[in-house]
Amino acid sequence: MCSSDLDNQPYGTAYLELLALAYPPGHPYHHPTIGSMEDLDAASLQDVRDFFAAWYAPNNAVLTVVGDIDEAGIVAAVERFFGGIAANEALPNHPDLTLGAPLGGEVRKTVKDSVPDPRLHLAYRAPLLGSPDLPALEIACQILAGGRGSRLTRRLVRQEQVAQDAGLSVLPFVGGASLVVGSATLRPGANAARLEALFLEELDALADRGPTATEMERARALIESEEMSLRSDPESIADQIGMYATLLDDPGRINRDLAIYQGVGADEVQRAAQIFSAQNRVVLWYEPIEHGAEATA
């Protein structure tokens, strides 16, 4: 999805705003890695050719083939179709993803835009893809926002009725820090400050007291269901294998994923939830534009 697609959706720019708030200026994640329409419009044909020549080379590519295949035949076909493409012996260095100081305190912003209802967005820096702490954090997000029985949905949507929806998930990155992002849309007539307070209260409760045995069992079952669904689709399998090969140099990780999640304990989930602190928090509110007013970002 390009940035122009995000711009044209209600709340669509929230992802861009969260990146800019969670990562410092100059960091590669401060802006979307896909770039912007402004970048594309400013690029010359030579810029595009140079970029292609620099990065699109066989020694910088991963080809994944899944299914009931003849391995020798596939290797021969790859050699036939791609073997004549020259490698790039001078691949550019990847950008430095090192993060200096932590957030060091809550970062807050309000955006007035053409949206139907106020919506709360949260972000927290998180462990990297491949870190042993990330699966525990993903289980924490399932406990907090995985379906109707999750803590946030039960408390904010069904019990207190301050939100129309509630979500929390991990955006895994391989450098700097991953990001946990959450959101909740204010129910008409409800109080925005109360919605935010209740959302944060549920995050704090998991960090303070950890999950119950029932919650751990439910979260593992949800993740197992997602894994089984992924493995029923060849395209999803190929995408997952390709991601692990490209980012972690570990294509076989897909065969260990389920065991990794099943091996996470409640104490590890509670420890992972410690990232939900005010010192590591980005708060972004979207508010509808009043009639006749201009959007602000």
Give a label for each model feature.
Residues 81-89, 200-211:
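A common structural junction motif
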